[in-house]
Amino acid sequence: MSDVVINPGREKGEPHLPDAGLLCVNPGDAAQAVSLAKERQGLRHFLFNSNLFQIPAADQEKPYFMAGPAVGAPMAVLTLEKLVALGGRRIIVYGWCGSLHDTVRIGDVVLPTWAVSSEGTSAHYPLNVRPESHSDTRQALKDLLIDGGLTVHTGPVWSTDAPYRESRDQVKQFGAQGIFGVDMEYGALVAAAAFRKVELTAVLLVSDELWSGTWKPGFRSKLFRKKSSSILHLLADFCAG
């Protein structure tokens, strides 16, 4: 490990987090997470320009944390680093992705394994092996989501810093290689988590389709928003289980 100038740490007065928690990438989901955390008597803490709530144990439920938003690889990893420094060890990331494959449709869920990284953050977390999401948690989440009536795909994704620069050739190439979706954060998050030796799993709701060469957005519909909220509640309950 290189001799870096700044290491993440817990400052005076900052909380000791439970080991399990949920990081919501998107602002809309993070806003719903704030409301849910308040309903569950969550204690709010400072976290950059994001939110952080510590949810206490209740009845048979374990304590956990909820954080977000954290859009883009640099902010997502900055947030992850702080969560790990505060005690997070088993982190579920909830976000959205675009579909690169004709079998993956709006409203489906992708559970990413590894990533093709075009973002600039993951390279700062060098590893000897390709990082992947935590397999046991990924399988448990797959079972949970399927039981909830969702269509689930497990496989690699492409992470990019520039969604407005995704070319048709790239979409076609990655789709042909079996890359299911494209997002902005996962490749960096899974690399940083492996570097810090913590467990990370991601759940990506398909918000739009790119595979045809014509962009098809789906995130504006009420049905999509309702499904996104439902998944958020499922994941919060999973963290408490």
Language model features by range: what are they?
Residues 1-139:
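Metabolite-binding pocket within alpha/beta catalytic cores that recognizes anionic/polar moieties
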Residues 41-47, 150-155, 241:
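Flexible, glycine/charged-enriched surface loops at secondary-structure junctions
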Residues 89-90, 180, 199:
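Short acidic/polar active-site loop segments enriched in Thr and Asp
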Residues 128-177:
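Active-site rim beta-loop-alpha module in soluble metabolic enzymes
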Residues 140-148, 192, 234-241:
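Generic non-transmembrane alpha-helical segments
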Residues 187-223:
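Zn-dependent metallopeptidase/amidohydrolase metal-coordination segment
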Residues 212-241:
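His/Asp/Glu-rich mid-to-C-terminal helical/loop segments that flank catalytic regions of hydrolases
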